[in-house]
Amino acid sequence: MKKERTESLVAQALKNIGNDRYMLDNLVFVRVKQLNAGAKTLVNMDPKRHKLVDIAIREIAEGKIDIDRIDERN
């Protein structure tokens, strides 16, 4: 069940950034660095209970993070 949900989140995240897997990898990497440095999550997920990668993917899938917004935060 969780695998299906993760796959659908990744599919939605890819759709939100134009189906570019390399861009998704880069966005997730940068966002995980930000979260690790103390940035607040933009979704209702506790970083102590969830993997930062999962949080970053959900943020992208929900449209809260994209290439323009990630550049502003760096």
Swiss-Prot record:
Gene Ontology biological process terms, A to Z: DNA-templated transcription
EC number: 2.7.7.6
Keyword field contains Nucleotidyltransferase: yes
Species per Swiss-Prot/TrEMBL record: Helicobacter pylori (strain Shi470)
Enzyme class: transferase
Gene Ontology CC annotation, any one: DNA-directed RNA polymerase complex
Name of the featured protein: DNA-directed RNA polymerase subunit omega
Disulfide bonds: none
MF (Gene Ontology): DNA binding; DNA-directed RNA polymerase activity
Keyword Kinase: no
Family annotation (Gene3D superfamilies): 3.90.940.10
Role description: Promotes RNA polymerase assembly. Latches the N- and C-terminal regions of the beta' subunit thereby facilitating its interaction with the beta and alpha subunits.
Quaternary structure and interacting proteins, as annotated: The RNAP catalytic core consists of 2 alpha, 1 beta, 1 beta' and 1 omega subunit. When a sigma factor is associated with the core the holoenzyme is formed, which can initiate transcription.
Keyword line: DNA-directed RNA polymerase, Nucleotidyltransferase, Transcription, Transferase
Protein family: Belongs to the RNA polymerase subunit omega family.
Superkingdom, natural source: Bacteria
